[in-house]
Amino acid sequence: MGKTKTRGRRHQDKQRKDEFEPSSNSAKEHIQQEESTYNDEAEIKETQPQMFFGVLDREELEYFKQAESTLQLDAFEAPEEKFQFVTSIIEEAKGKELKLVTSQITSKLMERVILECDETQLKDIFQSFNGVFFGLSCHKYASHVLETLFVRSAALVERELLTPSFDNNEKEGPYVTMENMFLFMLNELKPHLKTMMNHQYASHVLRLLILILSSKTLPNSTKANSTLRSKKSKIARKMIDIKDNDDFNKVYQTPESFKSELRDIITTLYKGFTNGAESRSDISQSTITKFREYSVDKVASPVIQLIIQVEGIFDRDRSFWRLVFNTADEKDPKEESFLEYLLSDPVGSHFLENVIGSARLKYVERLYRLYMKDRIVKLAKRDTTGAFVVRALLEHLKEKDVKQILDAVVPELSMLLNSNMDFGTAIINASNKQGGYLRDDVIAQLIQKYYPEKSDAKNILESCLLLSASTLGNTRDDWPTAEERRRSVFLEQLIDYDDKFLNITIDSMLALPEERLIQMCYHGVFSHVVEHVLQTTRVDIIKRKMLLNILSKESVNLACNVYGSHIMDKLWEFTAKLTLYKERIARALVLETEKVKNSIYGRQVWKNWKLELYVRKMWDWKKLIKEQEFEIFPNSKPLQPKPEKHSRERNNSKEGSAFKKQKHYR
């Protein structure tokens, strides 16, 4: 008898009871209910700190606006002049620091000043915020100033740690280390940690503090994948042209006290979320559900991801991981419902993708085995959610499990690429990592998608880069789009993956009208694809000649272009053993010497092509070419003597001509 489907009202009620559906306000309500865990004083004042410190008068505002413009222009003749100017700003700002950092206009000035000031001035600014760090971290503009301040402070902590006599450089007065000042600030923030975790601005500050305390890389504040700032903040920072100094994008050594503080912060948060439970068995299901709601909250989720990443430094039990997920070998209905939500929600899938990368392998294997193994293809088809989790599994599971995933997913790859091109990269990397597992099948699927044999109009530049719908050839000076960058990088990965894609790409380029290919050379993104196919040892000599026939006609204009000049640099090597083409390009550049040398890009091409040597000592230039050819093709055979038959014929003809000459003279 077949398995009957369970039905009935009781079963439906049980399903509804186990179903995970976060309430949009539940996390915030949870904060308000449990804020008293940290501080028994008025809760409203804590969650909404008083942040008005007055306003600058008109003259002060005008001075600081002008100072900000001057720093932005950065037209100082010497570093000393710039430092004196920064010092004068700091002197003028004394007593007004809080007004400055809470203003949209002048907060940018404070960031610039913090980036340029010396260590003593940095400490003075840091101390001016004592008592209001929490309030500033919750402020839209001041929170950015704090982030910049904390990164520079972390660099100073390391410097003091590694330089025992550092205090000799300090001015008169009591010496306070940056470490002690940092610890004092952390004590001020501890009563508000839970509020900060779910606060729009303070959550970024908290994440940065965790990175500093755990000695992780402090990322660049403008990079797209930076964990330091929100997407809007990174865009705004680029627009106002605030550049990070050398203290960013580094890992800093920290004192032991920082590790203790990290343990204290994470332990405090854990006790707050579990109501001080002594063991996991004392934690109620409702508490676990509420914390899971935090895990899928778009503000709190990145903080929890980071906590799970660093908690292993001192907590072997991985308490936060075990608060989110079970560790038993059996399925749990509530956990299953939660996993299903994670795999179908954008925030949830991003959370799961990140924690998989930092969790113990046995925990990841458990989740995969219980909840994902039997439906991996279905998850891969969820291009905005589950596909990211599958990619993370391919990176972190053991060889056996990765091969199982590849067995299931590779036959569907050409279809999956329709909506998720990055998935192709993950498959290629996983296949390579497993010694080229299913390599031929992967290549076949990729060719089926981008260069189908049965198609008469096949062109990988159209199918992969979507040239017809791109910004190529636009006269409006449109910036290349992020989608175009993503597609170009993927095609470059395919070119590196196998020679078939290199040859397919070259064939597609040669199939384009010449004008279209030249337009690609001047495009901010597609020029990289042209540059990438110019691989001397991988491209056969016939195709090299066909490409050079087109590119050499445009050599002067390419040399004077920001993107085309890189292609010209590659042609220096690409013309190896094709001396005729190399000389043709060199001659064209020399004929337009003035135009080339008047261009900053042209001068670099002139240098890389050794054209001064070409003009002054042609034979030395040709000798250099021969050396280059031998370096690129060390195993190439020298010119062979002609066969013996031809040699005899030549000798006979010589003897015959000599006999005729002798007869003539007689």
UniProtKB/Swiss-Prot annotation:
Region annotation (Disordered) ranges: 1-40, 635-666
GO molecular function, one term: RNA binding
Basic residues composition-biased segments: 1-14
Basic and acidic residues composition bias: residue spans: 642-653
One GO cellular component term noted in the UniProt record for this chain: small-subunit processome
Residue ranges occupied by any PUM-HD domain in the UniProt entry: 23-435
Main location: nucleus
Record's keyword annotation contains Repeat: yes
Pumilio repeat intervals: 92-127, 128-163, 188-223, 286-326, 334-368, 369-407, 511-548, 549-587
InterPro entries: ARM-like, ARM-type_fold, NOP9, Pumilio_RNA-bd_rpt
Family matches, as Pfam families: PUF_NOP9
Keyword list, A-Z: Nucleus, Repeat, Ribosome biogenesis, rRNA processing
Compartment annotation: Nucleus, Nucleolus
GO biological process, any: endonucleolytic cleavage to generate mature 5'-end of SSU-rRNA from (SSU-rRNA, 5.8S rRNA, LSU-rRNA)
Family stated for the protein in its record: Belongs to the NOP9 family.
Assembly: Component of the 90S pre-ribosome. Component of the pre-40S ribosome.
Function, in words: RNA-binding nucleolar protein required for pre-rRNA processing. Component of the 90S pre-ribosome involved in production of 18S rRNA and assembly of small ribosomal subunit. Component of the pre-40S ribosome required for release from the nucleolus.
Something else known: Present with 2930 molecules/cell in log phase SD medium.
Name this polypeptide is given: Nucleolar protein 9
Gene name per UniProt: NOP9
